[in-house]
From Swiss-Prot:
Catalytic activity: a beta-D-galactosyl-(1->3)-N-acetyl-beta-D-glucosaminyl derivative + GDP-beta-L-fucose = a beta-D-galactosyl-(1->3)-[alpha-L-fucosyl-(1->4)]-N-acetyl-beta-D-glucosaminyl derivative + GDP + H(+)
UniProt temperature dependence: Optimum temperature is 23 degrees Celsius. Vey low activity at 37 degrees Celsius.
Record's keyword annotation contains Signal: no
Entry EC number(s): 2.4.1.65
Pathway: Protein modification; protein glycosylation
Gene: fut-5
Membrane topology, from the record: Single-pass type II membrane protein
Origin species: Caenorhabditis elegans
An example Gene Ontology molecular-function term: metal ion binding
Protein name as it appears in the record: Alpha-(1,3)-fucosyltransferase fut-5
Cofactor requirements of the protein: Ca(2+)
All ranges on the Lumenal side of the membrane: 29-378
Disulfide-bond pairs as recorded: none
Length: 378
């Protein structure tokens, strides 16, 4: 009897010991696994965040340093997990390096070639179309592209629109009553590849009322001089116009700049564009703008504009989209940096997939543009 009791105690103790060992081993494995993942879970264990993604901007953007403020409109999650800096000391610890195409020089190129880091992506950021991007021959230097094109590694558009969860309240009468002028064209660059100047001047000859402003015509609005006007003066100046010319300096794949987004957005005008295909390919609602190439000739286009100008019901059809969609405030294209942070966070503590552009010029080439459009109307 006594022997049986001792045997039972021994078996019970052995069972408890085995269970304890399994629990400790399992717990230890879980801790080690979570350490490898950079995260701790459980009771009194300290929560440890994955280190922030560090994006080093090796060049400025048109001489203006690119800093953390570029993330100001990103989600809080992204802002808390990412840092953007132009501090040269971050080069050895950076998770990515960004170069703006118009600000790269031979000195920088030589340094970063000589001191190449193969564990992180070198990123070419180009917001201009191929005619103005300023690219020279970069062979086997860049790993990722960050441009306005949807097929970029990082899509970096000038603007975007999102569908509203709840239909917005739109005061159509207020919009109509604020419109006292027909069409505005504010333009600075006269060196366009697509003959936009000639097309606009032809429209005027056909009877379209267009007010011309900007460096090209050496005329600035007195109440809102370029870069010197009071805050909000641009909205006040543009808002009375029913339409605004939004011709880009080249007709290129996916190339839609702030010329379009601001006019449709904060200015509440109807943008006039050259060709519908570029905008439709981006999924922009057809009713947000008017395209010249919807008409067989300029006479019919001008007739349509004149008809819509004097007809409230017809004009307001171009504002119906405001109930369903809203334009995202892009703040000069920071959408791309939000997406870059998100993508890099997914690669944190992993090897970034290896990829290199053998010849970047062949990717960002003028073959993605068609500047012959206007000639059929001239």
């Amino acid at each position: 009897m006594k022997h049986n009791t001792l045997r039972a105690v021994f078996q019970f103790s052995f069972f408890i010991g085995i269970c304890t060992f399994i629990m400790i081993a399992g717990y230890s494995y879980q801790i080690n696994y979570n350490q490898r993942m950079g995260i701790f879970y459980g009771g009194n264990i300290t929560f440890k965040k994955v280190p922030k993604v560090v994006i080093y901007t090796a060049t400025p953007f048109f001489d203006v340093p690119i800093e953390n403020s570029i993330l100001r409109d990103c989600s809080e999650k992204i802002k808390n997990s990412c840092t953007v800096t132009s501090n040269n000391k971050t080069f050895p610890i950076a998770d990515a390096i960004v170069f703006h195409s118009r600000d790269i020089n031979e000195t920088k190129l030589s340094f970063f070639n000589k001191n190449r880091r193969y564990d992180i992506p070198y990123i070419m950021m180009a917001m201009e179309n191929p005619f103005f991007a300023g690219l020279t021959v970069y062979h086997n230097f860049f790993n990722w592209t960050m441009t306005y094109r949807t097929d970029s590694d990082i899509f970096h558009p000038y603007g975007a629109f999102v569908k509203s969860y709840v239909p917005a309240e739109v005061n159509y009468s207020e919009i109509w009553n604020s419109k006292t002028k027909e069409t505005l064209w504010m333009v600075s660059n006269g060196n366009a590849q697509n003959k936009r100047k000639e097309l606009v001047e032809k429209l005027i000859k056909k009877g379209m009322s267009i007010d011309l402003y900007g460096q090209l015509y050496k005329k600035e609005p007195a109440e809102c001089p370029r870069r010197r006007g009071p805050p909000g003066c641009d909205v006040k100046f543009h808002s009375p116009y029913k339409f605004a010319i939004a011709f880009e300096n080249s007709n290129c794949k996916d190339y839609v700049t702030e010329k379009f987004w601001k006019k449709a957005g904060i200015y509440k005008t109807v943008p006039i564009v050259m060709s519908r295909k570029i905008y439709r390919d981006l999924g922009i609602p057809d009713s947000m703008y008017i395209a010249v190439d919807d008409y067989p000739n300029l006479e019919e286009f001008v007739h349509h504009i004149q008809n819509v100008t004097s007809n409230e019901e017809e004009y307001m059809k171009y504002h119906k989209w405001r109930k369903q969609f809203k334009i995202v405030d892009t703040n000069e294209g920071n959408i791309g940096f939000c997406q870059l942070c998100q993508k890099l966070a997914g690669y944190k503590r992993k090897l970034v997939p290896h990829k290199v552009y053998e010849n970047l010029n062949s990717w960002h080439s003028t073959s993605t543009c068609d500047n012959s459009f206007a000639t059929r109307f001239l």
